[in-house]
Every structure is written in structure tokens, then in C-alpha cells.
Amino acid sequence: LFPYTTLFDLDIKIENIVASASIGKDIVLTEVSEALEGVNFNREQFPGLVFKLKDPKTAALIFSSGKLVCTGAKSIDDSKLAIKKTVDLMRTIDTEIPHEFEIKIQNIVASANLESTLNLEAVALELEDTEYEPEQFPGLVYRLSDPKVVLLLFGSGKVVCTGAKTRSDAKLGVERAYDRLSELDLI
């Protein structure tokens, strides 16, 4: 199935995870901003408040609808922990905030190095489902359908994977790109 990637193990590094949760209850943002330290709230600039956690180092966006979006985590566990810590702190202000809520991973951004330079013009000509406009952006955009991820390929051999919901999808996306580039003698 993967004749080329067995030659070496592609090291995938998670750069950022975006997760969300809905606590099913409206939140009075002014109360939260006054009660918690590390909160930025300016309704004219942004409809939610930004709460920065030190451990794990993340930022949570809190909206009056009760929806939270956490960004900046480097692992799924840290992402979930950040949301749980944020909700626990909010519960000290509003004890009616439910203890049960679902956390969804929305996006994983990961990077890898293919250990080989790429001729992006040749890749754009040979590889399907790509966009390459070097005047607009130095990377080549490669869209995969399985797994459903978008890869940014750079001439240096660096790759950024976005849109993954799991670490394994990010890794599989990079491996499939490597295999396809190998099949076409582009790497």
C-alpha cells in the first residue's frame, strides 16, 4: 500500500489544534470578563471574549451563546484540558453551567519535512487537485479527499497539513502525498 514511506518514518509535528465546545447555556460575558484574570473583552472589536490560559498555553474564545473555541494547543489532550479548565473557572461565576458537554476537534495543523526539495512547477503539472500561484503564495496547495485534508507543499520539502480531525489523518495525508510524489518521480 505504501511502498515509499516505509523507507523512513515521516515525523509529523502538531503545530496547533482548534477545538470547540458548547455548554448549552448563555453566558454573560461582562460577568466573566470582570471575574477572570487574563481576559480581553471589547465588544466593538470582537463579539466574544478572549481568555488566555498559561497551562496549557492556549487561548479560549468565549461567546455569549455558550460556545467556546480553543486554539493554540499542541496536543488533543491539552486542547481538551484547556476547555475543561476554562469551563471550570466559568462555573465559579455561574454554578448552573453543566458539567457534561461535548468537545469537538475542529482542525489540526501539523508540519513535516519530506527531506527532499520539490520543483513545485513540475509538481503542479503532474499532480492532480493542486493550485500553484507563486505570485500569490510561495506554496503549492494540494487537496486530498481521503483523508480530507489540505497540504501546503513548499520547495524546501516542508509540508503543512491543515483540516485534519485526528493526528493519524494528518500523518496519513502527508504519507499519501509523499507516496504520490514518489510514484511520479517528483521526490
Pin down the residues of each PLM region.
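Intrinsically disordered, low-complexity polar/charged tails and linkers
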Residues: 9-150, 156-158, 164-187
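Short, small-residue-biased leader/transition segments that mark boundaries at the very start
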Residues: 1-7
